[in-house]
Amino acid sequence: MRPVFPLILSAVLFLSCFFGARQTEASASKRAIDANQIVNRMSLDEKLGQMLMPDFRNWQKEGESSPQALTKMNDEVASLVKKYQFGGIILFAENVKTTKQTVQLTDDYQKASPKIPLMLSIDQEGGIVTRLGEGTNFPGNMALGAARSRINAYQTGSIIGKELSALGINTDFSPVVDINNNPDNPVIGVRSFSSNRELTSRLGLYTMKGLQRQDIASALKHFPGHGDTDVDSHYGLPLVSHGQERLREVELYPFQKAIDAGADMVMTAHVQFPAFDDTTYKSKLDGSDILVPATLSKKVMTGLLRQEMGFNGVIVTDALNMKAIADHFGQEEAVVMAVKAGVDIALMPASVTSLKEEQKFARVIQALKEAVKNGDIPEQQINNSVERIISLKIKRGMYPARNSDSTKEKIAKAKKIVGSKQHLKAEKKLAEKAVTVLKNEQHTLPFKPKKGSRILIVAPYEEQTASIEQTIHDLIKRKKIKPVSLSKMNFASQVFKTEHEKQVKEADYIITGSYVVKNDPVVNDGVIDDTISDSSKWATVFPRAVMKAALQHNKPFVLMSLRNPYDAANFEEAKALIAVYGFKGYANGRYLQPNIPAGVMAIFGQAKPKGTLPVDIPSVTKPGNTLYPLGYGLNIKTGRPL
């Protein structure tokens, strides 16, 4: 019997951390200066500046031939921050390459905004959407869904938050609480916790609380839900056709739970929801009538989110340069429409990459001023938005700034925190726990190679095969497996040929990674067509050819699903099949994500995978049937369901 006291103690410590965040916020608000008084002293231009959050991902200084990644503050960018008094800046991977450089940059940003500190934001979701060059990336939300642990979710949020705080970043556009109930979704997928509303709500809430524990402003996204779409709003305008009853029961459910628990921010979705707003607008792209997306809808932002769901925090748009908005609405017009709808912060309202383009900011401000002047936007609405922004800055310790350390001291502290051994250990442990065994017939796993055995590594891209290779080298170095011979095969856009079959035939073991964004194999008469010559189908055709060759030559073969686990349905004939929920590999001397190494550890019996599916995997040969249901996963040793 397991000792009870350690379990009780860990639970008490966890819950004390969870609820302690509320106490910290409450005490901070008591000693804070009054946000309303600050707003009353601001000019209209200053207030409107607070409602804009541009990016300076790349910058072209005078005399340079093209924009370059902005990793170091310069006088030109600093002058724009001071002039327009922006409420915040969003940072991208181009801006946060090393710990030292990032701390220096964020410090310089704040020095350029002496009146009211900036919200310095980032998309550090964990998993496939991460920006920090030297941070702890974690296996991602769907891996958390497979692990099914509130403590792991809280720990993930807390560690990410701790690293961001050390770097001077105070706002994280995370967690994603979209319910991924559409297997054809091209943009959410493993960024979602689950297709189950309860699991998504629970893990989203605890991730949010982990971030807030570190005084990071957390933004739920993408409201009212981007999970049941088959179009990526970066490239098109998606539509969700469900009725209000279904949307309230499913899509809105995780948002409501997190709002009730004290959400700081909500990020909008550039998605059409005719059940909530069927207003049409003439597209600037082709003159057609289109439904107004949620980001620009007053019925959704004010009527639904504010009034019906009771959200009193900060609403921020998704990036306004995404094609769902940029293709159909004018730049200034989109910002005005978003603010009219009830949004507080316009994210990336204009793309400015040099001083020559500065007037784009001026035009956005002027358009907003004119909307206030002519009564389209009441000034009291502007005041309310800015008061919410300032209140959040106070609540999360941005204003007044708490950290009085020198830049040198901040860098020294950050280097001890960001990507620390302790954090990487937690990341590794979670990734290994999340690995989900879907098949292990004839005890194919774990592989037990003899000295000199030949292992063939197959994956679409070089960094993925490199990750598998490096993990095997690490196992050999630690004497967990005997020295083996490795060969690699990268198959992106490739056709399976005789030389590939020869490599399979010569191997003693074969590890194959499948990487699919949208799973759409060609099926004829209930069978996957492996003869298809369409070059766009390589992601399915090639790994299936490897599998079939391995079966023909009686070679131990394991298929590792690297991204959305729906592609597992393409390999029913395989005897061993696992899902790891993350595809990033190994480059520049570091693992970009812990998922592939965790899968390799499981394959060689050096980890104990405990994951169960957070989504249903539909059959591709029998439409309407579920091949592997939500909650399915096998014990790798016994082959029995967990």
Curated annotation (Swiss-Prot):
Tell me, which GO biological process terms does this entry list?
carbohydrate metabolic process; cell wall organization; peptidoglycan biosynthetic process; peptidoglycan turnover; regulation of cell shape
Question: What is the main EC category here?
Answer: hydrolase
Query: InterPro entries, per this entry?
Result: Glyco_hydro_3_AS, Glyco_hydro_3_C, Glyco_hydro_3_C_sf, Glyco_hydro_3_N, Glyco_hydro_3_N_sf, Glycoside_hydrolase_SF, NagZ_Beta-hexosaminidase
Localization, per the record, is: Cell membrane; Secreted, Cell wall
Which Pfam family would be a valid example here? Glyco_hydro_3
Q: What induces it?
A: Up-regulated during the late phase of exponential growth and during stationary phase.
Q: Where is the lipid attached (S-diacylglycerol cysteine)?
A: 17
The terms under GO molecular function for this entry are: beta-N-acetylglucosaminidase activity
Q: Which domain of life does the UniProt lineage start with?
A: Bacteria
Annotated keywords: Cell membrane, Cell shape, Cell wall, Cell wall biogenesis/degradation, Glycosidase, Hydrolase, Lipoprotein, Membrane, Palmitate, Peptidoglycan synthesis, Secreted, Signal
Q: Primary place of residence?
A: membrane
What does the record say about pH dependence?
Optimum pH is 5.8-6.2.
Look up and give the membrane topology term.
Lipid-anchor
The pathway entry for this protein reads as: Cell wall biogenesis; peptidoglycan recycling
Q: Which GO cellular component terms, listed alphabetically, does the Swiss-Prot or TrEMBL entry include?
A: cytosol; extracellular region; plasma membrane
The UniProt record gives the binding positions of substrate as: 123, 131, 191, 221-222
Span of the secretion signal?
1-16
Q: What is the effect of changing residue 234 to G?
A: Strongly reduces catalytic efficiency while increasing substrate affinity
Q: What does this protein do?
A: Plays a role in peptidoglycan recycling by cleaving the terminal beta-1,4-linked N-acetylglucosamine (GlcNAc) from peptide-linked peptidoglycan fragments, giving rise to free GlcNAc, anhydro-N-acetylmuramic acid and anhydro-N-acetylmuramic acid-linked peptides. Cleaves muropeptides, but not peptidoglycan.
Spell out the protein name for this chain.
Answer: Beta-hexosaminidase
**Species this protein is from:** Bacillus subtilis (strain 168)
**Gene name of the record:** nagZ
